[in-house]
Amino acid sequence: MYLGDKSGKLYNEKDRLVINQWLMAQMGTVGPMIGQHHQFHHYNPGKSEFGEERYFKITKRIYGELDARLKISKFLAGPDYTIADIATWPWMARHEWHDIGLKNYNNLSRWYLEISEREAVVKGYSFMDKESIIPKL
C-alpha cells in the first residue's frame, strides 16, 4: 500500500476503497486459509483428516468467490490490474497443490492466465529459482 501510494502505480485513488477491500480479503482469508490448505494437504497429508477436509472446503469456496467476482470484473478491484491482484495471484499459482481444478473456474482461470503472462510476474516467479516456471492450467 505504501509503495503503491508513493509511486502512484497499481493503487489508484479512484478505486482505492475496492482495492483495499480485496487486499483485506487476501490478508484475512485467501492467504491464511489457502496457506492452511497447503500445510495440511500438500506438506502433511494424512496427519489430520479434519484439517485436510476443512481447508480443502474453504479453499474450494474461495475459488468460487474469486470466480464470481471475476465474472463481473476484469481484475479483482475493477478494470485495472492493481496491488490486490499482485497480493492474491501467488496463492493461485500453487493451484496444482490444491487439487480443486482451476480450469473448472472460467473467470478465475482467465484472470490467472492473463496475470501469469505479465513480464514482471514471470520475472518475479523465477527470481529465487531460475528453473521455476509458472504452472499453466
Predicted regions and their residues:
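GST superfamily/GST-like fold recognition
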Residues: T29, M33-H38, L76-N104, S109-I115, ...
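Amphipathic alpha-helical packing segments from all-alpha helical-bundle domains
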Residues: E52-L70
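Structural helix-adjacent loops and short alpha-helical linkers that scaffold large soluble proteins
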Residues: K9-N12, R54, D99-N106
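GST-like domain detector, emphasizing the conserved glutathione-binding G-site
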Residues: M1-E53, D67, L137
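Generic structural signal for secondary-structure transition and capping sites
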Residues: G8, M27-G31, G64, A68-F75, ...
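Charged catalytic carboxylate motif
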Residues: V18, I58-I62, A87, N107
